[in-house]
């Protein structure tokens, strides 16, 4: 069993989940006038929902919550708010996944306070119900146990974050490549390493160039 369970998400799954989410919104009888993506994870799902729902107006708000892969900041905050007049508009806020729910809750409060919308509802592709303190109005998938979902749009960022998590927790900055890859298997599982192998190597090269990790090709003991 990996130390950190990771589910690698395909783009086909994203399209299917966004379609499922759009169906739930339509079935509720509610139609948004504007979609607001929570940057950065909400960009792709929000754009897909615009397509499924026939919405032409797409904005974004950035809420900072996760500093790196499988790490959590002490407190989420709005980094770049929306600052436009949305009077009379029905607004749908979209994120990729709701973990604690802090990001979605903050985005909703920010838009309600600064933009004067008629109504604000929230949506996410997935909700981890075991840890969520704020539930969105709509979601496609319920996740009952915590898993790190590795989406297509932050593959390099995840890979770099996972590498640096190993470095921080082991206190070791110099690695044999084979040894580091075996550690990845133990920590993150076969699926992640097999499907994201190229991204892991890319992130290793990037971190090596920045002087954060030193990797050499040698056989691990």
Range-by-range predicted roles:
Residues 1-221:
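PRPP-associated nucleotide enzymes
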């Amino acid at each position: 069993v990996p130390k950190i369970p990771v589910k690698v998400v395909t783009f086909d799954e994203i399209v299917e989940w966004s379609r499922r989410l759009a169906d739930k919104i339509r079935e509720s009888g509610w139609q948004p006038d504007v979609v607001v993506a929570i940057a950065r994870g909400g960009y792709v799902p929000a754009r897909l929902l615009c397509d499924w729902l026939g919405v032409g107006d797409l904005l974004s708000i950035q809420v900072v919550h996760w500093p790196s892969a499988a790490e959590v900041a002490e407190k989420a905050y709005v980094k770049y708010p929306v600052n436009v007049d949305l009077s009379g508009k029905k607004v749908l806020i979209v994120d990729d996944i709701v973990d604690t729910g802090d990001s979605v809750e903050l985005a909703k409060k920010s838009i309600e306070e600064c933009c004067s919308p008629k109504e604000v509802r929230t949506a996410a592709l997935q909700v981890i119900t075991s840890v969520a303190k704020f539930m969105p109005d709509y979601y496609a998938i319920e996740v009952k146990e915590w898993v790190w979902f590795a989406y297509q749009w932050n593959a390099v960022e995840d890979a770099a974050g996972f590498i640096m998590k190993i470095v921080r927790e082991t206190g070791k900055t110099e690695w044999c490549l084979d040894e580091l890859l075996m550690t990845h298997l133990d920590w993150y599982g076969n699926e992640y390493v097999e499907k994201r192998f190229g991204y892991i190597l890319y992130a290793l090269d990037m971190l090596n160039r920045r002087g954060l990790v030193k990797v050499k090709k040698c056989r691990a003991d």
